[in-house]
Regions:
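Acidic, Gly/Ser/Thr-rich repeat motifs that build Ca2+-stabilized beta-propeller blades
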Residues: 25-178
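N-terminal signal peptide c-region/cleavage motif recognized by signal peptidases
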Residues: 20-22
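Bacterial N-terminal signal peptides that target proteins for export
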Residues: 1-11
Length: 178
C-alpha cells in the first residue's frame, strides 16, 4: 500500500506540474525572431566562417572566397577561373552545375597562424598523377591559405586533399558535379 500511494503521489505531482506549465504557456512572453541582412548582392553564397573578432569569411559558389571585416569592408581574396576583382586568381578552380567553391572554415588557432581552409572543385590534378577508377579526374580539393594581417590577400596555397571525386560521368542525377 505504501508503494502504491507513493507512486500515485508522484503521478499527481507530475500531472499538476504538467497542467501548470501548459496553462502558463498561454501567458508566457515568447521571444520574437527578426531577420536582418548583413551583406547583400552575393551570387550563390555557399558557406560562412566567423573569427572571434567578428570578421566573416564566405564563399560564393562561382566566384570565390571573400571576407567582410568587422569594420564592414569587403575584401575579395581568392577568385575562381573567369572571376574578376580578387586579390589572387586560381585558374584551376571552376564552377559548373553543382560544382564550385563550397566550404570554408578557420583554423582553431586562426588568431595566431592566420590559416583558412577552403573546399572547391579543381581541374589541377586532371590527367598526369590522377589516381581514380573513373574516366575523369576533375574533383574537389581542400586547400589551406594564410590570410594577411590586413585581411586583403592570401598566400601559401597548400592543397591538402587532392582527390575527392565529385562526378565520375555525365548524368541527370545530382551527386556533386556538372
Amino acid at each position: 500500500m505504501f508503494k502504491t500511494s507513493k507512486f500515485l503521489s508522484a503521478v499527481a505531482v507530475s500531472a499538476a506540474a504538467l497542467f501548470a506549465s501548459s496553462s502558463n504557456a498561454d501567458t508566457m512572453n515568447t521571444p520574437s525572431i527578426s531577420a536582418m541582412s548583413i551583406h547583400s548582392g552575393l551570387e550563390s553564397p555557399w558557406d560562412m566562417a566567423f573569427t572571434k573578432a567578428g570578421d566573416m569569411f564566405y564563399t560564393e559558389k562561382c566566384k570565390g572566397l571573400s571576407v567582410k571585416t568587422k569594420s564592414g569592408s569587403v575584401n575579395a581574396l581568392v577568385g575562381m577561373k573567369d572571376s574578376s576583382g580578387y586579390a589572387s586568381a586560381n585558374k584551376d578552380l571552376f564552377c559548373s552545375g553543382q560544382a564550385g567553391m563550397m566550404g570554408v572554415t578557420l583554423d582553431p588557432n586562426f588568431k595566431k597562424n592566420r590559416r583558412v581552409y577552403v573546399a572547391s572543385t579543381s581541374n589541377k590534378y586532371h590527367g598526369s598523377g590522377c589516381k581514380t577508377n573513373f574516366e575523369r579526374c576533375d574533383g574537389n580539393i581542400i586547400m589551406r591559405f594564410v590570410v594577411s594581417k590586413d585581411m586583403k590577400s592570401v598566400s601559401d596555397r597548400t592543397d591538402i586533399v587532392k582527390d575527392i571525386q565529385y562526378k565520375p560521368f555525365e548524368s541527370d542525377h545530382p551527386f556533386g558535379g556538372p
